[in-house]
Design a protein with these regions (language model features):
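Glycine/proline-enriched, intrinsically flexible loops and inter-domain linkers
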Residues: 2-85, 90, 94-115, 119-606
Length: 607
């Protein structure tokens, strides 16, 4: 169901309303960043704001929207006719909301917005909270085998009625956290952002009229839907295209898991079928994927060169069907753990890129690496127990027109400043730099990961980490090479250096130990021999590529700080040109464990 559109706005008015909504959403973000207390929200910017129409369709959001349907689960419990101005609703229950939120630390708040007593929109904000209980400080552990170990679950509840807060509900929730004051501050910031967003929406309606604003909502959705449908029609031929990508492990068992996607297009309709994906994992890499997520992934990629197109629910309208199978990695059954769902979410992205590469003759981005988190849970003789949870950046895949992004945690988030990390977490950051040669070679180079040296200052500590793409590096496309894998080493320059598990928890460390975390790079795109030699030289001088890789991977011979053109031409003339689509350790067209993948999946939809 969509909103009625009785009064179409002029193009000028539509742009004014777009600007007002985007400004209001940015103002909500600024409020959260200033007022929140936890590092995840205040420094890393792990939060999200949006406006939705009265049917719950996303109208305005951040540029990276991977949330599910945020309103339907609330409306099931609290019908629209029971809502009042000043009400505020709250949840983090992944299973209870069908994947509206993807893991428990992401706490969602939604406020209905009224005009003259009639509901016309919702203002929404969520943030990743520092600790919500569970088996370990920080609530996320690679060793979790049940969602009950990952913190308290809040079903959709009304936390505010006509502006009056239900303090009892908040008190119960904060009592379950190891950091209640920090949690309370974050909740206040997010709730205030919703109130601010509702106020700005009301101002917009008072300025333009509710009918015009609702019509603008519909126009924005229709514009985005039309843009994605046009891109699909122009760039994806009718047919079936399949790809499978693998996750290193689930941290509980040593086996790898795969995400399997079959993309089907015919008669102007598009279907994305994940039903042949692996069974749900024992460990916490499960991802209860709302249907909107792969639709937004497709829309974000296909419309990324159209900056005037809004990232909104129009993407959902443009894709007819998402198919999953209960009990699989992307449709797990309760109470499978979910804390590391990003490992599977990123593999959904790379599987999508793989199918698009097959559909378009290689005109798709190479695979990104999965962003990294580590946990350092300290203990000192004076009884203090500092908690360090730090997200580390990786390399993203090369695009068809540009290098991959270097050293990025997630496109809409930030890295901790070193000064902040040292002051807040009781650690010393002794090195932070680019993981040289980690970006897959190509006409467009994959993004590079990073190297970060962390010195333990607590008397003792337990270390946990989630670092993927070590066994299964990010693949290259259309002749590009795969990115380099990651690694974790304790005391790398000492007498007894030791590699430790890249998916583990509870690893004992002592005061003075140094942990070197080396994160993976993204895949490259296109034949490395086609990269301009001067670009390769610039990468060498900037520390992204070594002289050895310049010669071995790109065929570029250097003489000091310049290109030896004659030697380069001779070396490149002797290099074999890749003829297969993908690269991961070797060039290939069909997946090793899926020889039928270049056409249709023989197992899609079967148990």
């Amino acid at each position: 169901m969509t909103c009625e559109t009785p009064a179409a706005p002029t193009r000028f008015t539509l742009e004014l309303i777009k600007g007002a909504l985007n400004a209001a959403r940015s103002e909500m973000e600024a409020l959260i960043a200033r007022a929140a207390m936890s590092p995840f929200i205040r420094e890393k910017k792990d939060f999200f704001t949006a406006f939705l129409n009265r049917d719950g369709e996303l109208v305005v959001s951040t540029s990276l929207t991977l949330a599910g349907n945020l309103v339907d689960a609330i409306l099931e419990e609290y019908p629209a006719e029971t809502m009042r101005p000043g009400d505020l609703y709250w949840f983090n229950d992944v299973y209870g909301t069908g994947g509206a939120v993807s893991h428990l630390p992401d706490m969602v708040f939604v406020m209905p917005v009224f005009h003259e007593g009639r509901l016309f929109a919702f203002a929404e904000a969520w943030g990743h909270l520092w600790d919500i209980g569970g088996s370990v400080p920080g609530s996320i552990s690679p060793h979790a085998i049940s969602v009950f170990q990952e913190g308290i679950m809040i079903p959709p509840v009304r936390v505010m009625r006509e502006g009056v807060e239900n303090k009892e509900v908040v008190r119960i929730f904060t009592r379950n956290s190891r950091f209640p004051d920090m949690l309370r501050g974050d909740l206040r910031a997010i709730m205030a952002a919703c109130r601010l967003g509702a106020h700005r929406l009301t101002e917009t309606v008072e300025r333009h009229g509710v009918e015009v604003v609702e019509a603008a909502f519909e126009a924005m959705l229709a514009e985005t839907e039309g843009a994605l449908r046009a891109e699909i029609a122009a760039r994806i031929p009718d047919g079936e295209y399949a790809f499978r990508d693998r996750i290193d492990s689930d941290a509980v068992t040593d086996r790898s898991y795969f995400v399997d996607l079959v993309l089907r297009k015919g008669g102007g309709a598009l279907e994305m079928d994940f039903s042949a994906s692996d069974r749900q994992a024992d460990g916490p890499i499960n991802f209860l994927m709302d249907d909107s997520v792969p639709k937004f992934m497709l829309g974000l990629w296909m419309c990324m060169d159209r900056p005037g197109i809004g990232m909104n629910g129009g993407f959902e309208r443009a894709v007819e069907r998402i198919v999953t199978r209960p009990g699989t990695l992307v449709a797990p059954r309760f109470p499978a753990p979910l804390g590391l769902r990003s490992h599977t979410m990123i593999r959904v992205t790379s599987a999508l890129f793989g199918t698009l590469a097959r559909a378009t003759g290689g005109q798709a981005s190479a695979a990104p690496s999965v962003y990294v988190l580590y946990y350092l849970r300290g203990r000192n003789a004076d009884g203090t127990e500092p908690l360090c949870i730090e997200g580390l950046s990786v390399g993203f895949g090369a695009r068809t027109f540009a290098d991959g992004i270097d050293a990025v945690y997630y496109v809409a988030q930030e890295n901790y400043p070193i000064e902040f990390a040292e002051m807040e977490f009781g650690v010393e950051i002794e090195a932070f730099g680019i993981h040289r040669d980690s970006g897959g070679a190509g006409r467009w180079r994959g993004g590079c990961g990073i190297v970060r040296d962390v010195r333990v200052l607590s008397d003792e500590a337990r270390f946990g980490i989630r670092l993927d793409n070590c066994r299964q590096p990010a693949f290259g496309v259309h002749g590009g090479l795969a990115g380099a894998p990651g690694r974790v080493v304790v005391n790398p320059d000492g007498a007894n250096p030791r590699d430790i598990a890249t998916m583990g928890d509870g690893i004992r460390l002592e005061k003075g130990d140094l942990v070197r975390i080396i994160t993976p790079g993204g895949g490259g795109w296109g034949n490395p021999a086609d990269r301009p030699a001067e670009d390769v030289l610039a990468d060498v001088l900037d520390g992204f590529v070594s002289k050895e890789a310049a010669a071995g991977d790109y065929g570029v011979e250097l003489a000091g700080d310049r290109v030896d053109l004659e030697a380069t031409l001779a070396r490149r003339a002797a290099m074999a040109r890749p003829s297969k689509m993908f690269h991961r350790g070797r060039y290939y067209d069909a997946d090793e464990d899926r020889p039928d993948a270049f056409t249709a999946s023989a197992t899609a939809g079967k148990g």
